Amino acid sequence: MGFINLSLFDVDKLMVWVSKFNPGKILSAICNLGIDCWNRFRKWFFGLNFDAHMWAVDAFIPLMPHYTEQMERVVDDFCSETPESKLEDCLELDTSVNEFFDEEVYKKDEEGVMKLQRSAARKHIKRVRPGMMQAAIKAVETRIRNRHTIFGDDMGKVDEAAVRATASDICGEFKINEHHTNALVYAAAYLAMTPDQRSIDSVKLAYNPKSQARRTLVSAIRENKAVAGFKSLEDFLGGPLSFPVEDAPYPILGIPEIRVAEKRASRVMKSKRVVGLPAVSAGLKVCVHQTSLHNMIVSLERRVFRVKNSAGELVVPPKPIQNAFDSISYFREEWLRKLSHKGQILKSSLADVVACYSSEKRKLYQKAADSLEKKPVQWRDSKVQAFIKVEKLECDTKDPVPRTIQPRSKRYNLAIGQYLRLNEKKMLDSIDDVFKEKTVLSGLDNRAQGRAIAHKWRKYQNPIGIGLDASRFDQHCSVDALKFEQTFYKACFPGDQQLETLLKWQLSNTGSALLPTGELVRYRTKGCRMSGDINTGLGNKILMCSMVHAFLKETGVRASLANNGDDCVLFCEKGDYEQINRNLEQWFLCRGFEMTVEKPVDVLEKVAFCRSQPVCIATQWAMVRQLGSLSRDCFSTQDWLNPKTFKDAMNALGQCNGIINDGVPIHMAQAKLMHRIGGNRKFNLDALHKQMEYSWRDRLGKRTNLLWSEVEDATRLSYFRAFGIEPYIQRIVEEYFSQVEITCEGRSTNVLPTHYSRIHKDLIKAR
């Protein structure tokens, strides 16, 4: 029996005719013709104008048949709880394993002095209880299914490898012996890759005609439904979208150190907006703080004057104990010896310092240099002019406090830059020489950083990586800490009175901030790093590296440090973690710094450094930016509503990210899409420099070729270990990026919905 060609009839007349019959009998007759006829009817039905035929929705939708199965049974099966043994209940201590490790504890000796003592402690290795192997296999299988998204015939070899890696990780978490781990990985992994009855039922539930019909209805309605002021969802997602910035949701504390002067004449300033690409983003909420009186006061209160203690109370930053840095002075002497082998440290001319800058900055610094030729630097040049940093922040988990940049005048920066700017590389290299390996990783591209971190990892037999979280490092730089840092500079230029004066002005700061609305905020601080100082990066590296070196020396722990200012990761043997965890926080607190020892990781790809993680790309290690970058790169405070500016930005982002992420899953696909939106233009260094003035050198190194290399299976597996995104999901997202179409026509809205992207934020989420 054939199916009537409904397109030959007048739809309105046909629907009036259909309405006279029983809708249930019509659907039954169509279903009896077969699934092809049913799908054709469904496609025609949902192409109707529902506003004119709303009765059809009410009549037909409740009667959509289950077609092949009674789906109520499937739902009941899902809801019925079948008790299964927990993995921990299937395990017991394996007494046959005689493996020990050196346990280190501090104990008082006979004289009452705390000394490090080592003793052999048995490793707590477990095995599967007799008769419970089947239950243990089922428990591991369940855990695998909960961590992975898809199982079926479309799984490739790399997907199978990812499943086996997950099974191995589960056994490692529970410290199961090697023999039983081998059995569990082999059995549980392949069981998990074989669809069970629940997997089959879930497919039935998702793809039965009734479920498909409802999804089609939702899609049809969305095409005609207004979203956030737009005529449809497609219109909302189709191009760059502008929305306003907001104030940070924190109350003002009203501390006396901050004063607000009477309102002056306000400047004419256009309200800043953020422009994003909803269709290309990975779905995270991205916010930018506006320059307002509220944000300025909140930032100064919580990033300059007050910190949170362990009880969550806002208090003044901790002070170091007396003579806290005396025990670290040896590091300075050793550093000076290494520095002496790198040639003479000379004061630069103003012209040489000005030449370090480019573009508009060079013009401003040249003007300051001309001024210094006529009038020497004065104390008033060291005054701080603060402003709110315009940065893209991830606001899904918490609302960050606005950041304040606190620069001094360009006259002051040039004066102190004569001593430090051109000598900085030698000073940083000398830190590496003290550690006897590459330690300060700033200035390296992502591949060089990846190689350095992999080298540190391979130095140890049972390696772990320990992140050191220096909470608000600039805020915790006390007067004593800054004085200790300054001894490094003074030792390079002994007896130089001008340098001593310039450094002294950094110990006591007078700051102000003029807001666009006319308010003038004034404040004073003793100590505290001013984030706009020319020696901020160098000083933070000197302080952090010297303190970590002294801590390791005092405790006798053999470890390697990766440092980039206040970003630190320690690499050491697994057995040394407890000693570091037990002593480091108190050791740093005595010197005025609040440090948190993060949970150690025993997989190289899980090491987080400067918001990046190592991934093995075609046998070469490289640092890949964490998943939040997939959202942040899709937002800007530039005028992306202007088609030319938008295409130039997309071209620059696509080129830069395409080079640093060549051969990387998902990241390269997004970069390729951006490059396509930008017109697939050839690499242009000048255009890239214009768009990314501050970071392109460090990002690209010497690479200037867009290769778009094919993603290798081994890279997908390494990417999975780093971020937990299964290879199957990687390919789905890449396919989406290859097909999405974006217009350059910009639009505006007053609010960005919580789930604004086609890619839900939970899909590309580190696990």
Swiss-Prot record:
InterPro entries: DNA/RNA_pol_sf, Rev_trsase/Diguanyl_cyclase, RNA-dir_pol_PSvirus, RNA_pol_HCV
Top enzyme class: transferase
UniProt name for this protein: RNA-directed RNA polymerase
Catalytic reactions on record: RNA(n) + a ribonucleoside 5'-triphosphate = RNA(n+1) + diphosphate
Biological processes per GO annotation: symbiont-mediated suppression of host innate immune response; viral RNA genome replication; viral translational frameshifting
Family: Belongs to the tombusviridae RNA polymerase family.
Transmembrane segments: none
Organism name: Red clover necrotic mosaic virus
Role this protein plays: RNA-dependent RNA polymerase, made of isoforms p88 and p27, plays an essential role in the replication of the bipartite viral genome composed of RNA-1 and RNA-2. Replicase proteins p88 and p27 interact together and selectively recruit viral replication templates as well as other essential components into intracellular membranes for the assembly of the 480 kDa viral replicase complex. Mechanistically, isoform protein p27 binds to the Y-shaped RNA element (YRE) located in the 3' UTR of RNA2 via a direct RNA-protein interaction and to RNA1 in a translation-coupled manner.
Effect the entry attributes to changing residue 48 to A: Complete loss of RNA replication
Alphabetically ordered keywords of this record: Host endoplasmic reticulum, Host membrane, Host-virus interaction, Inhibition of host innate immune response by virus, Membrane, Nucleotide-binding, Nucleotidyltransferase, RNA-directed RNA polymerase, Suppressor of RNA silencing, Transferase, Viral immunoevasion, Viral RNA replication
Annotated EC: 2.7.7.48
Annotated ranges, domain RdRp catalytic: 463-580
Molecular-function GO terms, alphabetical: nucleotide binding; RNA binding; RNA-directed RNA polymerase activity
GO cellular component, one term: membrane
Impact noted for substituting residue 38 to A: Complete loss of RNA replication and membrane association
Effect of residue 179 to A: More than 90% loss of binding to the Y-shaped RNA element (YRE)
The keyword Membrane belongs to this UniProt entry's keyword annotation: yes
SUPFAM superfamilies documented for this protein: DNA/RNA polymerases (SSF56672)
Pfam family, one: RdRP_3
Consequence when changing residue 45 to A: Complete loss of RNA replication
